[in-house]
């Protein structure tokens, strides 16, 4: 009996047929699997978006109210706050947890929000948080105008958010976009500093010491790397990196208010940003105190007619205690619900870092220009007509902050530990209103560590600037930016007493 089997020809034919079948079926199976993964990924993203919608309902007060404004919710925040089950939300193509963000965009034409999942989380600046008596404005047609529900800022295009305080908010509050806000009605201008994290290149890929990105010249530093973040993001990196890939991001101290005084970074103590006065604080040039040149003789703490505008006389000769108390009382004069206060050095540093970035005065990572100097010898804010002095702006255009370089030395609410008790206060101010430095060594001045984002040791000597830290008991305060009588830059700092002729101050507001 013969054994039956395949001949070689038959075997080759069968293998050929199987190969043809495989060529047909494998792509079909691969495509089917890919479609299944794409469907599963889409479903996972929908789960994330639904969780974001629930989150948004619980935090509705933080959502944007102007057309095109974007609120970013991190997927990690949804996990941390139990809106998502970490084990179930995975990328089916990698079997790893899905990260990224949900962008919540306000669409005014529909009166609702658009939710989109994205893998990128650092594209948009946090929406400005306004006090109910602050009026958002946009600069168009050579004037400040109401915004209605339209988009009014774009940090990616160096257009910073501006708001004003007017004598009568009801006159403008419900107007459509495009109505001029008269200068005579404005008493104060403010600029929004959105929350960000930063890192500074210390050495390039060639191992050379650098000052900002890829600059070996301390007199011409490169950009500071910045990414905008949400309030839930707390980056605790070193704030510097080696090589050409930014890493080790750090959230500046300015975006944290330790209300509990426990040195714990509680989520409820984080800020999505803060407002800084667009100009130094001033009086009308013909005010009796400005004319006499002796503000110390004025009851300035309760004085009306204090402005944060250009072409005003910067308030000087006042002394720290009066500056501090004037700043606190200014919010009452402006009918604000949120407290005004004297700017801290940490806030000055944050504004300076934003300026030294692609969102400020840098046209590329290796090409940044120093903030122009207000050299008005009469200490006039904005150098006079600020519209003609745009080089003095923190971002090179009219939406930025002025008087950071020149004008007056700006006294900050920042002191050496134990000194504030000796400044004449009957009761010490709340600790969130000042920086308490613990050492005369600026590299160890924040609890034996670097003061992150304060523009002290991290940017020492940039643009060839003068720098003197808090050195001794007789000169234990800290001023920034130089005045119109010297050639210091915005990066300059100087130890100071509490009553100096060329010291003024700037107002800050943190709206919760």
Q: Which residues does each PLM region occupy?
A:
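C-terminal, surface-exposed recognition/capping segments
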Residues: 346-349, 380-382, 386-398, 404-512
